[in-house]
């Protein structure tokens, strides 16, 4: 059940930033910093676009994703996971 929730949170987050075209900074596990907008994703990878160029990024290589602007995924107060 926890794995299902984590997957749903990941999909919800990625779908939100894709639909709103929120600029992201993505850090890979090797320290490389990527920036761009998510245009597509699946269970294993995402497509990141910047300056008219697209990069296919494998999710297993991603360490951290930081949105360029605050996002609100769920309605409610401070602890929406309860």
Curated annotation (Swiss-Prot):
Q: Which SUPFAM superfamilies match?
A: Sm-like ribonucleoproteins
Query: What biological processes does GO assign it?
Result: regulation of DNA-templated transcription; regulation of RNA stability; regulation of translation, ncRNA-mediated
- Where do the Sm domain residues begin and end? 11-71
Q: Name one GO cellular component term.
A: cytosol
- Please provide the record's keywords in A-Z order: RNA-binding, Stress response
State the source organism's domain of life.
Answer: Bacteria
Q: One GO molecular-function annotation for this sequence?
A: RNA binding
Matches recorded under InterPro entries: Hfq, LSM_dom_sf, Sm
Quaternary context: Homohexamer.
Q: Which HAMAP family match?
A: Hfq
Q: What does the UniProt function comment say about this protein? A: RNA chaperone that binds small regulatory RNA (sRNAs) and mRNAs to facilitate mRNA translational regulation in response to envelope stress, environmental stress and changes in metabolite concentrations. Also binds with high specificity to tRNAs.
Family label? Belongs to the Hfq family.
Q: Any idea what this protein is called?
A: RNA-binding protein Hfq
What organism is the protein native to?
Bradyrhizobium sp. (strain ORS 278)
């Amino acid at each position: 059940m926890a794995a299902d929730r984590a997957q749903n949170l990941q999909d919800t987050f990625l779908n939100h930033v894709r639909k709103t075209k929120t600029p992201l900074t993505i850090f890979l596990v090797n320290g490389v910093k990527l920036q761009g907008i998510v245009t597509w994703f699946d269970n294993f990878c995402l497509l990141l676009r910047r300056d008219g160029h697209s990069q296919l990024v494998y999710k297993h290589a991603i360490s951290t994703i930081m949105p360029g602007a605050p996002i609100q995924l769920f309605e409610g107060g401070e602890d929406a996971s309860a």
